[in-house]
Each structure stands twice: as structure tokens, then as C-alpha cells.
């Protein structure tokens, strides 16, 4: 599995601001979107382009345009929605597919409860977005769902990842790519990433 920890100074600076304990909902939401945008920039660096001739202000001009697979952005509900706007700033024509996952309280296994995928997803590259990759359960379940629907070109974008989640994801789906702003130390006894960001969903939606 290709694993990319984006070390750009802007990414590190913005993520550092997100770690502040007393950060406002507005600021956290803005930064989640901004870092999501920067991760998208990195994740799409290998997109193929082709030469196209267009009508420029002074006549025909040859330009580069992206070719190949189109993109679908896949936010995992609910926290993934906080990164979606930033992703779409870079790929505004991308279609949106939505997946909802919850954890069964008895088995602790992830259970899909909602999915709305674009109709031609097998022809698209999926950018799956979720702020945190902790145990990896929700992400693995989402990718299982996407592959079952015929999508096999998949890149994962997360703000923070735990080594435990990375290992689980690599074991389940070694063919995908992971882009993260930080690989943190690991999980605590409650399953939170340390130092992490706390509950990203609560901070994005103001429900903490």
C-alpha cells in the first residue's frame, strides 16, 4: 500500500492549529477543509493529462487537460463532510458518493447504514475522505463497499492516522493509496488517536 505523509509546511502548520484544545468550531471546520484541499493536491499529482487545442484570446492555443478516470469524492458520514468542500475546491466537477458507517455496540464491528454511490462508480477514481484513521474499521468497510460496487481505483485522504489503523488498512486493502497530514503515535485505551484531534466529528459539527 502506498502511504504518503504530507510534510508540506502549510499542512503541518494548519494541522498544528487544529490540535489546540480550545479551538472554535468555526476555525476547526475551516482548517479541516483547508487541509483536505492540500491533501487532494498531493493525491492527484499523478493524474494523466493530454494536450488539447482551445480558442485563446489571440487564437488557437495548446493546453494541458486532465484525462482518464473521472473522480468521485466519498465522504464517510458524518465527519468526512468536514473535508469535502476543500476537496471539491480542487476537483469541482467530481461527483459525490456518500457512505454512512456505525459501530455495533455489542460486536464493535463497523456496519454500513447508508450508501448513495454514483451510478458509474466503476469508471471513476474514488477519493475517500474521513478526518481520522484510528482502528481502520470504518475505512475498511467503506472500501469493501466501493469494491463490491465495482470501484477499484481508490485513494484515502485523512487528517490524522494511527499506526494501528494503517496496518489494518494495508492488510485488508494493499492496493489502495493513503494520504495523511500526520501519522501519530497510536491509540489510547478508549480508541482515540494520540495526540490526535479529539472527536473530529463533534468539533466539525459543534456537538462537543
Curated annotation (Swiss-Prot):
GO MF entries: GTP binding; magnesium ion binding; uracil phosphoribosyltransferase activity
Catalytic activity: UMP + diphosphate = 5-phospho-alpha-D-ribose 1-diphosphate + uracil
EC class (word): transferase
Activity modulation: Allosterically activated by GTP.
CDD domains: PRTases_typeI (cd06223)
Positions annotated to bind uracil: 193, 198-200
Cofactor(s) required for function per UniProt: Mg(2+)
InterPro entries cross-referenced by the UniProt entry: PRibTrfase_dom (IPR000836), PRTase-like (IPR029057), Upp_B (IPR034332), UPRTase/APRTase (IPR050054), Ura_phspho_trans (IPR005765)
Textual note on the cofactor: Binds 1 Mg(2+) ion per subunit. The magnesium is bound as Mg-PRPP.
GO-annotated biological processes: UMP salvage; uracil salvage
Keyword Amino-acid biosynthesis: no
Domain of life: Bacteria
Family of the protein in this entry: Belongs to the UPRTase family.
Function per UniProt: Catalyzes the conversion of uracil and 5-phospho-alpha-D-ribose 1-diphosphate (PRPP) to UMP and diphosphate.
Protein name: Uracil phosphoribosyltransferase
Annotated gene: upp
Amino acid at each position: 500500500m502506498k502511504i504518503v505523509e504530507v510534510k508540506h509546511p502549510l499542512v503541518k502548520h494548519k494541522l498544528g492549529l487544529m490540535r489546540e484544545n480550545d479551538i472554535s468550531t468555526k476555525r476547526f471546520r475551516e482548517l479541516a477543509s483547508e487541509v483536505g484541499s492540500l491533501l487532494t493536491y498531493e493525491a492527484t499529482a499523478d493524474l494523466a493529462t493530454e494536450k488539447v487545442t482551445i480558442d485563446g484570446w489571440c487564437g488557437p492555443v495548446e493546453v494541458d487537460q486532465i484525462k482518464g478516470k473521472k473522480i468521485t469524492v466519498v465522504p464517510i458520514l458524518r465527519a468526512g463532510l468536514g473535508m469535502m468542500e476543500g476537496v471539491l475546491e480542487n476537483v469541482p466537477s467530481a461527483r459525490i458518493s456518500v457512505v454512512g458507517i456505525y459501530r455495533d455496540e455489542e460486536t464493535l464491528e463497523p456496519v454500513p447504514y447508508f450508501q448513495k454511490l454514483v451510478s458509474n462508480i466503476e469508471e471513476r477514481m474514488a477519493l475517500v475522505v474521513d478526518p481520522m484513521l484510528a482502528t481502520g474499521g470504518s475505512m475498511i468497510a467503506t472500501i469493501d463497499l466501493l469494491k463490491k460496487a465495482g470501484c477499484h481505483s481508490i485513494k484515502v485522504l485523512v487528517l490524522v492516522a494511527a499506526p494501528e489503523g494503517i496496518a489494518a488498512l494495508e492488510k485488508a486493502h494493499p492496493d489502495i493509496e493513503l494520504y495523511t497530514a500526520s501519522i501519530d503515535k497510536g491509540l489510547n485505551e478508549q480508541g482515540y488517536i494520540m495526540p490526535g484531534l479529539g472527536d473530529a466529528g463533534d468539533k466539525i459539527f459543534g456537538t462537543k
